[in-house]
Amino acid sequence: LCWQGGTKEENTQGVINAMRNPFVQIISHPGDGTAELDFEALMKVSKETHTLLEINNHSMAPIRHKTVAAPNNLELLELAKKYETPVIFGSDAHFSTMIADYSNIMPLVEKAEFPEELILNYQPEKFMTYLKPTPEK
């Protein structure tokens, strides 16, 4: 075992610490259920630090058996909408035909009535300007 989760508070603080790192731009699949997290706290820090939270398509694939992934990602979308915080979609492609496959995400987008302008995948210029500046090494 390479990682052992902690409490919801410990897990959330660990992710927040990563988000405050100037070299971290995106937190990948926080909603997949691997760790219990406080999504509202993460969304607030996402807005503050310009660290994007990824909505991960593959974590919701039936073959993954991650039953909390869809409700967690729906909650993330609802919070992003509430706080007007951009997100990024990830296909997490495990095969070439799965690249840019958002088929598990789109029903959640519709259910949340999530605004397209908060999806940075569709706006490369906005994506690049949204990223926080990376310090020189």
How would you name each of these model-derived features?
Residues 34, 60-61, 95, 124:
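Positions that flank functional sites
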Residues 55-57, 91, 123:
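Active-site proximal loops enriched in glycine and acidic residues that flank catalytic Cys/His/Asp
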Residues 36-43, 63-77, 96-110, 130-131:
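Histidine/acidic-residue-rich catalytic or RNA/ligand-binding cores of hydrolases
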Residues 85-99:
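Short acidic/histidine-rich active-site segments
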Residues 73-88:
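Conserved short secondary-structure transition element at the edge of the structured enzyme core
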Residues 3, 30, 64-65, 93:
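Conserved short-loop catalytic and cofactor-binding motifs
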Residues 1-55, 59, 110-113, 118-119, ...:
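Extended substrate/RNA-proximal surfaces in nucleic-acid metabolism proteins
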Residues 94-96, 113-127:
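C-terminal domain-boundary segment and adjacent tail
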